Amino acid sequence: MRGAFLAAAAAVAGTAMADVAHMRRHGHDSFHHNRAYQPEVPAEGDENCECTTKVITITGPPTLVPINTPAPEPSSSSSSEVPSVPSSESSVVTSEAVTTLHSTSTATVTVVTTPGVDATGAQTPTGGVPGTPEASSPAGTPEASTPAVPATSESPLPTPGVTSFSSTGIYTIPATTVTVRDTTTVCGATTTELPSGTHTFGGVTTVVSTATTVTCPVATVEPSGSTVTSKIYTTTYVCPSAGTYTIAPTTTYVPTSTVVVYPTPATITPGTYTQDEQTVTVTRTDFTYVCPFTGNDQPTSAPVASTSAVPVTTTAAPSTTSAVASSSASASSTATAVPTGVSGQQMGMTYSPYTNEGGCQSKDQVLKDVALIKQKGFTHVRVYSTDCNGLEYIGEAARENGLKMIIGVFISSTGISGAQEQVTAITKWAQWDLVTLVVVGNEAIQNGYTDASSLAGFISSCKSSFQASGYSGQVTTTEPINVWQQSGSALCGAVDILGANLHPFFNADVTPDQAGSFVRAQIKDLEAVCNKDVINLETGWPSAGNANGKAVPGTAQQAAAIKALVEEVGSQSVFFSYSNDLWKDAGEFDVERYWGCIDQFK
């Protein structure tokens, strides 16, 4: 939990070096049960619209790629000429390069490329999820062929076309017209650019003038291997009083500026929809463009009350009363307004599902605790291991409350071999749409449970296992600053983002009101270790115990320290911890049991 301050003292006058001998940690390993994994049983009757990413390989020189809509089925008709439905899922034209095109659609799409078309500055775009083009050796003179694709029973619908451009240039997206005869709800698509930090976007807002129950469709993403499926669920949501509510938004953390694509529910009514030809000038790589349909009947979102898509917001400035409904797989829940917290900037809270005696919390208690974390203004909950059905219970609560999870593989005194069971449990659980980060080890090097090179190898092994089960997010470990400074050369290549536990209390020259500036200085020092972004995975201040020089524990002191931490580094920090851990040993300065701080957030 605590980090030695071995870098040059910055931002805190008179800061002394922390005593590395005072690094005996919180004793997370003193109670870790490994319970049998219990898979979730999906609820019957869930409505869903599956919009599956299809991968189509094209061979040809750099050119403009027209994407045509397939011929309609009897329930709809198209006024534009469309290619015949072939019998294979890839369209191949032999040429001098191979590029992969990802296209998200509700119908089979045939992609035709004309060799020799000159497009100034244009490169072949990839549709759907951003992908990396693959190079190949020259294949000789181009010769067109049209492989067959299995016929599909789905009718083309005017869902927005999502295209990701991996290179700069000028691109043309051809016009398409579709006539729809039947009303249906589908997965639309929207893009937004997120700067570095934690953001909330998507979902559906509803404004009610009195207590009421809202039933509406919400869209979500469920990854499985290399396929990402957008699904629509019907949600029943209880608005307890008049106000503005957000139903099923998405909250995520991005280390750098990123363009994200997320699904939105859209009701397609009978009518003619036109997607005009679009010329797109791409000035940056990994650029994503959504080409919408327009027409006599525009797709609309959310059917009950006054609803609309939710714009992107950051946790620094929440402007609406936000509440999240559970999917139709669970009973409807009663929502409460989400307060702004200390200053509305705190990212995450650690949570361990243990009782004061060291037993496992009941499912009802876990659901209640996680709901309170959301109400206090947090966007993430950090879980250390798979103990006490933590993934299942906390995962269910996180989904109901619109929280994201930072999950962990805990390495104890049994070493790396003893942690493998948790890796297996996580890959079976595989609720990856909830997860933004996996932390392999919590101060495992600091505690002497492994060495840096062995940990780096285990991180890489875990990452491969997680990716094979559908995870595409970041993986890291977390250690105090002194370990990173000593072992960064071995660890940096294995992690996607540098994770650190930064506790100002363990520096004897830091007062509570200096906690934020002290940790900010440590983060700046850590950024130079791997030249990667840094996330503070544990930080806080004890509410009881004995003083460590100027670092004095106490309720008032904890409040001052938490306020300083939120103001300085809250958007990139996980606060330790939800409640006091009375099952632990007293530890140095008699503070190890008294880090619970959820009550400091209003």
Curated annotation (Swiss-Prot):
The family database entries (InterPro entries) matched by this protein are listed as: Beta-glucan_modifiers (IPR050732), Glycoside_hydrolase_SF (IPR017853)
Known catalytic reactions:
Hydrolysis of terminal, non-reducing beta-D-glucosyl residues with release of beta-D-glucose
A biological process from GO: cell wall organization
Enzyme Commission number, as recorded:
3.2.1.21
Gene Ontology MF terms? glucan endo-1,3-beta-D-glucosidase activity
Q: Where is the composition biased (Low complexity)?
A: 74-94
Its biological purpose is as follows: Beta-glucosidases are one of a number of cellulolytic enzymes involved in the degradation of cellulosic biomass. Catalyzes the last step releasing glucose from the inhibitory cellobiose.
- In its UniProt entry, what is this protein called? Probable beta-glucosidase btgE
Q: What is the lineage of its organism?
A: Eukaryota, Fungi, Dikarya, Ascomycota, Pezizomycotina
